[in-house]
Amino acid sequence: MNKRRIIEVLRHGQADDQVMVQGWLRTKRTLKDFSFVEVNDGSSLANLQVVLDGSLADYDRLLSQLQTGAALVVEGKLAPSPGKGQRVELKATKLELLGGADPGSYPLQKKRHSFEFLRTIGHLRPRTNTIGAVMRVRNACATAIHQFFQERGFLWVHTPIITASDCEGAGDLFKVTTLDLQRVPKNGEGIDYSQDFFGKQAYLTVSGQLEAEVMALAFQNVYTFGPTFRAENSNTSRHLAEFWMVEPEMAFCDLEGDRQWAEEFLKYIFKFVLEKCPEDMEFFDQRIDNTVLATADNIINNEFAWLTYSEAIKLLEKADQKFEYPVAWGVDLQSEHERYLAETVFKRPTIVTDYPKDIKAFYMRLNDDGKTVAAMDILAPKIGEIIGGSQREERLDILTQRMQEQGVPEEDLWWYLDLRRYGSVPHAGFGLGFERIVQFMTGMANIRDVIPFPRTPMNAEF
């Protein structure tokens, strides 16, 4: 028997094909001499309609056990479907119940469940239409990311999850230790980390950028794609404690090249997902956010807007809209400012460059004016910042000065400074929050619903 995924059957199956499908029952409808059941195997949004004839072996017993959530194996012959919505249906010649589901306790019944409720049953929510569609789009996004960089000769590098440095300087780090918390060793300065596993204080990484720079200065173009962590006590729809980051790093590249790479990258991802997940994207447009497809089209077919931070401040100061946070040169843009620029002023993704040096990280290249750095943020409608990047400071003396200004210990990053001593070149990179792009693409309101197992304050279930 030809084992097939349901998406293959629905797209390519022909009448009289003998097939076997495996999946989970979504709905059952019983008539006098036969029944209809809808089966889903996770490969597509659509279910496959299976026709069970009353003459099927053990029909009555099987029918009584076929409840929503039950796992099935069905064999039979495809036939043209007289109903609307799909070309073929499966007329069963054999049905096997692999695992039942008690209708009295199975929480996913044929009704609409809130996303808040679904988060409490994270082990079952992938079986719902919406979360299933999110995960297929997430998979397509990840595939697109790798394909984009691999087609362009980038090397995928694996940077450490455990680190001794705070790349971003934010301070919201998860500490890693094997010390006995009941008997913590002390010295004159406090905890004696020399007795810890690594002989020094260690953390979960917030970024693989610094290590990616190491690799870029050997292999030219590289990218990282992996989990990052931030112990920021934020219970909002935009924050996760564990999230995935994509961080390309390009040697012999300046801010203009960085901007071009980032724009091409975003357009590629959206185009790829629209081609690979058309039914899922249509679902999001109809059920979640009716601007999803228009937003994708806007990104793919329009040049991104581009202006400096100073120009952005002038536009915001002249805005008719009242902002919660004041606008002033030297103050970082808030989400409301970013969204105003992308949604109201330019109505498309917007790239803001050349931020004040005092609000950006030490590794960003100082511009000739001595006040700004060669940084960029890409702002997306409804989301705000979706990509942050910069040309890196390749000049040893200026990098050292910037570290001193920001209180970054040189001894902790001696190896990073060495990169500027031996064969230093202009280089640049950017970071994309993976969940942010999935959220932006699907229109999902809460970032906790675009990752399989969200990690947030007071929540590490499943």
Swiss-Prot record:
Swiss-Prot/TrEMBL catalytic activity: tRNA(Asn) + L-asparagine + ATP = L-asparaginyl-tRNA(Asn) + AMP + diphosphate + H(+)
The cross-references to SUPFAM superfamilies, in alphabetical order and at most eight, read: Class II aaRS and biotin synthetases (SSF55681), Nucleic acid-binding proteins (SSF50249)
Q: What InterPro entries does the database record attribute to this sequence?
A: Aa-tRNA-synt_II, aa-tRNA-synth_II, aa-tRNA-synth_II/BPL/LPL, Asn-tRNA-ligase, Asp/Asn-tRNA-synth_IIb, NA-bd_OB-fold, NA-bd_OB_tRNA
**Gene3D superfamilies on file:** Bira Bifunctional Protein, Domain 2 (3.30.930.10), Nucleic acid-binding proteins (2.40.50.140)
Q: Where in the cell is it found?
A: Cytoplasm
Task: Give any GO molecular function from the UniProt entry.
Answer: ATP binding
Listed A to Z, the keywords are: Aminoacyl-tRNA synthetase, ATP-binding, Cytoplasm, Ligase, Nucleotide-binding, Protein biosynthesis
Q: Which CDD domains match?
A: AsxRS_core, EcAsnRS_like_N
One biological-process term from Gene Ontology?
asparaginyl-tRNA aminoacylation
The answer to keyword ATP-binding applying to this record is: yes
Q: What is its EC number?
A: 6.1.1.22
UniProt GO cellular component terms = cytoplasm
Q: Which family does it belong to?
A: Belongs to the class-II aminoacyl-tRNA synthetase family.
HAMAP family in the record: Asn_tRNA_synth
Subunit comment: Homodimer.
Instruction: Provide the protein name.
Output: Asparagine--tRNA ligase
Name the species this protein comes from: Synechocystis sp. (strain ATCC 27184 / PCC 6803 / Kazusa)
